[in-house]
Amino acid sequence: MVMLLKDIIYKGIETVSTLYPEREAREMVFAFLEHQLGTKRHTHIMEPAYEVSHEDAEAAMSAFGRMAAGEPLQY
């Protein structure tokens, strides 16, 4: 099952903003996705149907959970 990039972004921001201010959480999510998936900050706007594989989506959600637990983005 694939997920849309925009859904991953929204869930990521929601998860990470439990520890960080929303603006900072947004920046962290975009930075992670740019590095991990090679997407740009505007990809979800330019390509609303951009799909992410199940494996990549799960890896992203796991990383967002770790960020929300205080693990630095660099790890």
Each PLM stretch: what is its role?
Residues M1-R26:
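Non-catalytic nucleic-acid substrate-recognition regions in nucleic-acid-modifying enzymes
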Residues Y10, R26, F30-E34, M61:
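Short amphipathic alpha-helical segments
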Residues L33-Y75:
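Conserved AdoMet
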Residues V2-D7, F30-E34, G38:
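Membrane-targeting and insertion segments and their boundary/processing signals
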Residues V2, V16, V29, I45, ...:
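Extended aliphatic helical segments
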